[in-house]
Amino acid sequence: MLKSVCMKPFASMKLPTLTVRILSTLCALTMVGLAAQAQLLYKISGKDLTRPSYIVGTVHVVSSSFFPQIVGIDEAVNTTDCVVGEIDFKEALSQDFLTRVSEAMMLPEGKTIRDLLTAEEMKSVNKALMSVTGADFDNPMVMAQMGRLTPAGLSNTLTLMLCMKHYADSFNPNDLIDLYFQKVARENNKATDGLETGEEQMRLLFGQPMEKQVRDLVCLCEHFDRAQQDLEDMIAAYKNQDLKRLGEVMDQQFLEGCSDGPQDRQQLVVDRNRRWVEKMPTIMSAQPSLFVVGAGHLAGDDSVLTMLRQQGYVVEAVER
């Protein structure tokens, strides 16, 4: 079913549930470098905590079937009372939020993607779109369905289609690992929460100047084969729980990929880490919690783990 969707134009402009959330986070994640570490799960204790909390790194396009392979995850889930994601999916799946996201992804009435790109840039976009759908913007149906997407919205949609085409047997945007953690929490009558609000994420991911959105879209399309290879390498490294290799892939993407360099990293990673670490002590003091965030936020001198240690917490890798 997923394969058939990605091999033909969308039947409507209603994007699949979670599309924006999943891919926006993936785009941010691919800009982040990681240190040479080999664990996905960390225990947080010490300071004023009477019971430990945990934090686990994910790659957001990996399915929930990988969940039991994370070393130590059962204990982390069973001994915590709340699962805290980057966003609370109760909000992300609400009709109000999905409507606002759809609006944020659309150009003003009367404008289309052709109005923003040169003829040569449109050729690059059409080539990428053709490779994952079998059609492009020269097809009136595709233009009617997707032509009003903002450049950022189109970048995210193309990345989703790439996942759907190359991981058709395992990729399901409604059965991804981040969502699964919160689903398990709800099934066990545990609380869920988010480190960011939907509004914060929309501003971050769809509030960029139009010139930057265009630049990022064109770069993605001009290097679409590279994007596919990076995605494959990233997922393979994560499933091997090889954060060293994952870091190498992401570092290379950060240095050579479609990024504005340190400015993007500061905004998408470092500033967010600081805001999260400001919120985490209150959450952990209230109840032991399991934090679920992109793996790129868990390593380096300005990572969430480093910042927690600087606040006096004991942060230990959960090993076999």
Language model features with spans:
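A cross-kingdom marker for long, charged
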Residues: 259-320
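Boundary at the C-terminal end of the N-terminal hydrophobic targeting segment
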Residues: 35-38
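Structured, acidic catalytic/metal-binding patches in enzyme active sites
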Residues: 40, 46-54, 59-267
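Bacterial N-terminal signal peptides that target proteins for export
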Residues: 5-24
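Short hydrophobic "helix-edge" motifs at membrane interfaces and signal-peptide entry regions
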Residues: 25, 47-49, 283-285
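Bacterial N-terminal signal peptides
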Residues: 21-33
